[in-house]
Amino acid sequence: MTNLRKTHPLMKIINSSFIDLPAPSNISSWWNFGSLLGICLIIQILTGLFLAMHYTSDTMTAFSSVTHICRDVNYGWLIRYLHANGASMFFICLFLHVGRGLYYGSYMYLETWNIGVLLLFAVMATAFMGYVLPWGQMSFWGATVITNLLSAIPYIGSDLVEWIWGGFSVDKATLTRFFAFHFILPFIIAALAGVHLLFLHETGSNNPSGLCSDADKIPFHPYYTIKDILGVLLLILVLTSLVLFSPDLLGDPDNYTLANPLNTPPHIKPEWYFLFAYAILRSIPNKLGGVLALVLSILVLAVVPFLHTSKQRSMMFRPFSQCLFWILVADLLTLTWIGGQPVEHPFIIIGQLASILYFLLILVIMPITSLFENNLLKW
């Protein structure tokens, strides 16, 4: 009798994706983040579902409903902080996953990479709208400032902003629609993640060497299932430690104050995972220019495959490109730090220099260095 997992219409899909999938024998722990992102998404959808059961998307009661969840609902505080810090873990895994893709040349799988960029935008949009829902000071002013950026779009800008707000300011209509979108988007993200995997399994995984691994494949189960379980346990350890010991470490104290349209917080800033893009936005004095730079800071990832000039796929054997990659990482950390600082000297000039370096590295310096490395090998 043939094995059921190989014949059953549903089970054979799972089998070919997670059990009998031929995987390269040398993929490192940097390849764990895909499964970790899947776990993060599941955690976010489940905790979000339970939060939505008690949350009310009305400006009068949103803040108190979140307080009610934390005080009166059984383990409501745990669900709320798992959801809030789960978002941070999600973004940590996302950034490491994208960084892995850049380092090892995984972006050469064009369809997979482009769906990934789309996923990044979708997750960022979801996180932004989720941050507005508790209706604290930073929720309200963050929503006001970020949505207002769309008014920089010529001709249709101001109409577009009022259309998104559902009125002349961020109010009840805005909160209700943000809740609706925040609820539906994770399911769209899950569907996109399925497409992401579909395209990945068309080509098979890349590996650290960047070389073709067709001659040396091993089954996904048990080797990488066990490896992924270790990653998941470590993720849960970090997440639960964060939630149970310092749940507010990554949050903003201003969000414990009810939203007040008449009182602007001294420093409006988004969650830590948006600070690098926020720093790029602020580094340009022109409003439209800042918005374009903000979008391009993520969209530039879609251009990376077309700027690949090296004859080797991975950076494993390219020391100069490796140095530039780690300079890029340091630059992004600098931008993240700058995004959380007030707009004053010397932070303004540091932010501007870091923003210029960010785009220069990706668009100019790294492709030229790759050409230089080709010549170095006399290829």
Curated annotation (Swiss-Prot):
Pfam families: Cytochrom_B_C, Cytochrome_B. The chain crosses the membrane at residues 33-53, 77-98, 113-133, 178-198, 226-246, 288-308, 320-340, 347-367. One of its GO terms (molecular function) is ubiquinol-cytochrome-c reductase activity. InterPro entries: Cyt_b/b6_C, Cyt_b/b6_C_sf, Cyt_b/b6_N, Cytb/b6-like_sf, Cytochrome_b, Cytochrome_b_C_euk/bac, Cytochrome_b_N_euk/bac, Di-haem_cyt_TM. It comes from the Eukaryota. One of its GO terms (cellular component) is respiratory chain complex III. Its cofactor is heme b. It is a multi-pass membrane protein. Heme b b566 binds at residues 97, 196. One of its GO terms (biological process) is mitochondrial electron transport, ubiquinol to cytochrome c. The cytochrome bc1 complex contains 11 subunits: 3 respiratory subunits (MT-CYB, CYC1 and UQCRFS1), 2 core proteins (UQCRC1 and UQCRC2) and 6 low-molecular weight proteins (UQCRH/QCR6, UQCRB/QCR7, UQCRQ/QCR8, UQCR10/QCR9, UQCR11/QCR10 and a cleavage product of UQCRFS1). This cytochrome bc1 complex then forms a dimer. This is Cytochrome b.
